[in-house]
Every structure is written in C-alpha cells, then in structure tokens.
C-alpha cells in the first residue's frame, strides 16, 4: 500500500511549497480521533484510476455539505479506513488500511494500492469513524507485461458542461459490459460563472419535461476554493458517480479545468504570466484533489510535474497519455476573432507538447506492442472548414493545426518507425469525427500513417444533431481523409484484440431533457498492419 508520502524539506520547498499558495487555510491541528461530521461524508462518491498489473489508485473526498465552505468539513485531518476485496460482498478482503484526509488537500483521499493479482476485478470502499460507509466501486488490474489479453475494452469521454445538459451518457457508461478502463480527455469541469451559464440560454428539462435550473454555482473560478467547489458541484451528479464507481478512469485535462484556451504560461486574456501561474496552480491542485491519479501527478510550484504518462496492457496495447496544454509554445493568435489577420508563421521550435514530452513520446512508441494509443485532447487531423461566404477557415490554432511543425514531427516520426498500429484518441471539439491521418498536409488524400477517433462531448453544446452548420463546414471534398462527422453527444468505446480494433460511436438522442437514450451511430474496424478504416 502506498499513501501520500511525508514530504522532505527539499520537496516541501520545491514542490509542496506550493502549499504556501493555498487559499484561506487556517492553521491545522492533527487529529487521529475523528471529529463529528455534519452529515454523510461520501457525497462525492468514489473512484479508481491508473491501473497497473499489481494495483491501482482508489479515491474519495469527504464533503458532507459539498457547496459549503471547505465542503462542510472541519479544518482537521480526518482518518479514513479503506478496504479492497476480491468479491463485491467483501468476503475476501486482500488489502486494507487507514489514510488521513487532510484539509490541505481538500479532504481528498488517494490510496495507491499494490500487491494485487493482474488481470482481475477488485472491489473497494471507504469508512469513517462511526461506521459510515461509502458506495462500493469496482476496478480491474492491468495484465502483466508479458501477457497478451484476449480483449481490452476502453471507453473515451469528456467535455461535460454542467449547464448544457444532463450526464445520462455516464449512466450508460456505468452499464457498459466488460469495460477495463475509461480515458477522460478533459474538460471535466467548466470555469464560467452562474451568470454566464444563465446567459448561455440552454433550456434544461427534467424527465417529465418541466424546465429546471442546472447552472454553475458562483462566479468564474480563480481561487483554490472556487475550483474545489465547482468540482464538488459536478461530482455530486449521480450519473457521473455511477460511471466512476464502475470503471477506472485515466484522467487527463484540457483547457476548461483552468481557463478557456489557456496555453503554457498564458491565458486568452493575456494576464501577466506570474498572475496566471497562481490561477493555474490553484486549478491543477483542485484537479489533483478530485482525480484518481497517482502522487506523481501532484502539482509542484516550480512547474516540474509531468502530467503525461504511459500505461501498458500486456503486449497488446501501450497508451501514451499526453498533456497538450502545459508545455505549449505561445500561440500566435490568442484572440480567435483576430485569427484572419494573423500571419501564420510558426517556427521550427514551436511545439504543442514541449521538447521533453515530445522526445518522451517518440522514444516510447513501441513496435513491439500490437497497438499504440495516443490518448490526448485536440485534433491532429488537418481539418479545413468553410466560412459561410465560402472561403477556407484556418488554421484552427488551438489544435495541432496551430503547431504545424510539431504535427509534422509526430506524423513523420510514426512513418519513420514504420508503425502501422497507431490510433489517436481525441476530444475537445464537441463533435464526432473519424479520420485516416495523412502523411502530408498538402496531400490530403494521400497515404495515411494513423487513424484518429475524435469523441464528442458528454453534454457540452446541448442536444446536437447529425447535421448542423458547425459540422457542415467540414466537407469531404476539403477533407477526403474524413470518414464520419456529426454534432451529436455521447462517447466512444474501443474493443481491442490482437487482430482487430473496433470503435463504436455511441450517441445520445438528447441531453437537455433527463432520460436520454443511447444508440450506436456507426462502427469502424482497424487492423494493426495498416492505418485504414473499414465500416463494420
């Protein structure tokens, strides 16, 4: 069992000196005897993440009153007991322990469980003094490095604006049979205010059709307490809790966990970097506190945290989880409204990943694995859209489009290694898109080097449609590599074997009214010897 470590003086100064930036913390008195809590403490559910062959992370956060100050918790460290069992009735408990939920970390609990068997399910739960128990979650360990699992099943989801619709898609995810893991590509929360949510005009209805308020609580997010409260609001959703309890999440982040379209040290308003760094640090601390991730993801004040990481599933799949926000070169056109006036001249040193992450990715692409999955946030495919007056729009600067040399290095690196098994998982754009990524941007119908599946949003942009102006602008004449595009809501599932990769595009009939139904819009097959898409 691994829990959050005691911090050395050096690490405190370099990394956890970040605690000096925490907002509004009073001095804390350690308490091994649990204080009386003002209500049921596990209102935010449970979660698991980042499975390895011998274990995984289990998570909860104590918040008897989620939207109150400090989640309704006293400013004390509270002991939380945890158990991991081989059966859902907890007849055979194989690991257990106690962890202090500390106010410095929003009373979150991250336990890194180890010493377990590979390729099998486990169940977990938490307790506080007095016997109050959490919900029960389930999670599977990964296979051993030398194993070839017969099948691996992955869901891909993200972009869940609370005020745009219900999270019914997560209820359907919780009912998906045999999921091994879910990759969350980001935009888990949105940073805007209640006033902005109200102004957006999305009309939300309950299952009976009555209009209800589903708005953000509070102002735009800047402080640690702001971000903590917003996560508490989102995590109070029962459908999201059900998904977390049913499958391990591989958590990443995009822009709205901090601020729209931020990149590196800049936000879109060009706030002085030293001030934006405070906001970003608060946001990333809250992301850590509310995500089932390992302690290596704990944010450091010196910016030294590497959020990118790699997970292997035997010799069947290597998953490269990227961070396409933290290390970006400065965007040339930070204001999208001025894009047409910008000269698009990215230098050879521009990067969406930064030099260290880019080198790490290229060195880790493995021909020895049957499949390589690049799990990231923004589209790689060179999409071109038409303006209403007919001219081509572009580049889409917030995507890999905005870093063409970085994209060329990625695509050329795949080609040079003669890899034919690279699949790219993408989100962010609130639409479904399926593509064969071409080797050259100027040969758009030329040979492909990878396939890309852009998964739509859970709720962002509301109900959506198969056809809409937002996707109609991407024609197949301009984008011959594009095999499907729509503006529906939902998620993707991957069924992966040694001989075949199948992606199912799962879509909702509605999200603005409670009770949306799920269907499969389309299915695609990829074979590991060629980056070609075939309709199933």
Predicted regions and their residues:
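Sec/Tat signal peptide C-region and signal peptidase I cleavage site
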Residues: 29-32
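Metal-dependent phosphoester/phosphodiester hydrolase catalytic core
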Residues: 2-24, 34-536
């Amino acid at each position: 069992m691994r829990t959050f470590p005691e911090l050395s003086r050096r690490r405190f100064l370099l990394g956890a000196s970040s605690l000096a930036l925490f907002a509004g913390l009073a001095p804390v008195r350690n308490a091994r005897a649990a204080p009386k809590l003002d209500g049921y403490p596990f209102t935010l559910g449970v979660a698991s993440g980042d499975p390895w062959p011998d274990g995984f992370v289990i998570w909860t956060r104590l918040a008897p009153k989620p939207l109150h100050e400090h989640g309704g918790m006293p400013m004390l460290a509270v002991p939380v007991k945890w158990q991991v069992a081989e059966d859902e009735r907890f007849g055979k408990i194989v690991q257990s322990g106690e962890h202090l939920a500390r106010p410095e970390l929003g009373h979150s609990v991250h336990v890194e469980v180890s010493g377990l068997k590979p390729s099998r399910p486990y169940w977990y739960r938490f307790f506080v003094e007095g016997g109050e128990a959490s919900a029960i979650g389930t999670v599977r360990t990964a296979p051993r490095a030398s194993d070839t699992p017969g099948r691996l099943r992955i869901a891909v989801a993200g972009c869940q604006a609370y005020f745009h619709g219900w999270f019914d898609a997560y209820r359907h995810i919780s009912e998906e049979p045999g999921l091994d893991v879910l990759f969350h590509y980001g935009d888990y929360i949105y940073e805007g205010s209640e006033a902005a949510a109200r102004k957006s005009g999305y009309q939300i209805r309950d299952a009976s059709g009555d209009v209800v308020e589903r708005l953000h609580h509070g102002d735009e997010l800047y402080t640690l307490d702001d971000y903590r409260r917003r996560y508490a609001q989102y995590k109070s959703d029962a459908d999201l809790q059900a998904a977390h309890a049913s499958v391990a999440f591989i958590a990443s982040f995009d822009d709205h966990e901090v601020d729209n379209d931020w990149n590196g040290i800049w936000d879109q308003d060009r706030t002085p970097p030293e001030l934006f760094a405070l906001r970003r640090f608060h946001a990333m601390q809250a992301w850590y506190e509310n995500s089932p991730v390992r302690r290596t993801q704990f944010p450091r004040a010196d910016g030294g945290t590497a959020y990118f990481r790699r997970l292997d599933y035997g010799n069947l799949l290597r998953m490269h989880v990227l961070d396409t926000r933290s290390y970006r070169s400065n965007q040339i056109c930070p204001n999208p409204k001025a894009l047409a006036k910008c000269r698009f001249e990215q230098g050879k040193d521009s990067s969406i990943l930064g030099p260290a992450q880019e080198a790490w990715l290229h060195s880790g692409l493995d021909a020895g694995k049957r499949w390589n999955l690049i799990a990231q946030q923004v589209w790689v495919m060179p999409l071109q859209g038409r303006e209403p007056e007919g001219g081509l729009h572009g580049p889409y600067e917030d995507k890999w489009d905005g870093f063409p040399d970085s994209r060329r290095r990625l695509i050329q690196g795949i080609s040079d290694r003669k890899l034919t098994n690279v699949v790219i998982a993408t989100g962010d754009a609130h639409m479904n898109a399926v593509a064969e990524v071409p080797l050259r941007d100027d040969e758009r119908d030329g040979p492909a080097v990878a396939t890309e599946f852009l998964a739509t949003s859970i709720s962002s942009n509301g109900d959506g449609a198969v056809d809409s102006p937002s996707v109609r602008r991407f024609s197949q004449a301009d984008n011959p590599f594009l095999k499907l595009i729509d503006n529906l809501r939902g998620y993707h599932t991957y069924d992966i074997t040694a001989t075949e990769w199948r992606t199912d595009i799962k879509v909702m009939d509605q999200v603005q009214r409670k009770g949306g139904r799920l269907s499969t819009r389309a299915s695609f097959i990829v074979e590991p010897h060629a980056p070609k898409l075939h309709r199933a």
